Amino acid sequence: MALPYDPDSWPANWILQLIAKDRLKEFYLSTHWKRFRLRLLKSRPCRCQLCEQKEPAVLTPLRKPWEKKSDSNDRRPVAIVHHINEVRHRPDLALSEYDEHGEPNTIIVCPGCHWDEHHKRKIPVTEERW
């Protein structure tokens, strides 16, 4: 279980410095992230957790990044590890499977659901009157 948020802890301090320099991509290229991501992908089923929650449930089989396509008809998308608590908002949880309440901080998703999570349509502040 993670401890309460501490911006002076590692990796939070390092990630905040990267964000300030607009170089957050360096975190995702780091050995720390690659090892963490690899461990998660090896230990969890390779299915989109968000597709499974849809009604009706959709089982989206995913390909692990190191797997080659089995043939030219292999259309499985590559699995993505998604942070539920965005790294920009909770850098202390960047390398944690769970948050301080024991809730999952990372999930395996397909590229479509990952895009949807990062580009959610914002709810308008005022009611649309068209």
Regions found by a protein language model. Name each.
Residues M1-R35, R39, E52-P77, I123-W130:
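A boundary/linker detector
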Residues S30-T31, F36, R44, V87-R90, ...:
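Surface-exposed loop/turn and secondary-structure junction residues enriched for glycine/proline
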Residues R35-R44, D99-E103:
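Short, flexible, mixed-charge glycine/proline-rich loop motifs
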Residues C48, P91-C113:
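Short beta-strand-alpha-helix junction that forms the catalytic/metal-binding core
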Residues C48-L50, A79-H89:
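Histidine-centered catalytic micro-motifs used for acid/base chemistry in nuclease
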Residues Q53-A57, E103-E128:
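Short Cys/His-centered divalent metal-binding micro-motifs
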Residues V78-A79, I107:
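Hydrophobic "anchor" residues on beta-strands that sit immediately upstream
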Residues R88-P91, E117-H119:
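Activation segment
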